[in-house]
Amino acid sequence: MLLPKRVKWRRVQRGRLKGKSKGGNSVAFGEYGLQALEAAWITSRQIEAARIAMTRYIKRGGKVWIKIFPDKPITAKPAETRMGSGKGSPEYWVAVVKPGRIMFELAGVPEDTAKEAMRLAMHKLPIKCKFVKREEVGGEANES
């Protein structure tokens, strides 16, 4: 599972999930991508489950890139504990994902194989996603 080697602060505030993704919203490394359509916290276990689902389907062909990293610690207090007495200890790590973010990329496989691999990965994630293809260089210039 993914988690940071070291962090500056052990506990962080929860924050809010508003707005669209500022960066990472285009397919950069592979040919195909999995784009988030909703905002959510994606846990390191969910990322790993999606990665395993994709790599098992494409077998030895192709390459998978994970474009999100769980760098936010989520704390929890033990069960049946009274309120107060400080913030709980870090339990797991999440990646903050906003709409438009490309979470996974895939290359080196046919489009139908990539679509099915991404579909299997979508079932492991708690948000709606869509399959996207890499834009041609000319297509990106016309958008601006």
UniProtKB/Swiss-Prot annotation:
Key words, A-Z: Ribonucleoprotein, Ribosomal protein, RNA-binding, rRNA-binding, tRNA-binding
PROSITE patterns for the chain: RIBOSOMAL_L16_1 (PS00586), RIBOSOMAL_L16_2 (PS00701)
Q: Gene3D superfamilies given for it?
A: Ribosomal protein L10e/L16
- Gene Ontology cellular-component annotations: cytosolic large ribosomal subunit
Q: Which Pfam families match?
A: Ribosomal_L16
What are the GO BP annotations of this UniProt entry?
translation
MF (Gene Ontology): rRNA binding; structural constituent of ribosome; tRNA binding
SUPFAM superfamilies documented for this protein: Ribosomal protein L16p/L10e (SSF54686)
Keyword Cytoplasm applies: no
PANTHER family per the record?
A: 50S/60S RIBOSOMAL PROTEIN L16, LARGE RIBOSOMAL SUBUNIT PROTEIN UL16M
Subunit-structure text: Part of the 50S ribosomal subunit.
Q: Which family does it belong to?
A: Belongs to the universal ribosomal protein uL16 family.
The entry's function note states: Binds 23S rRNA and is also seen to make contacts with the A and possibly P site tRNAs.
The entry's protein name is Large ribosomal subunit protein uL16
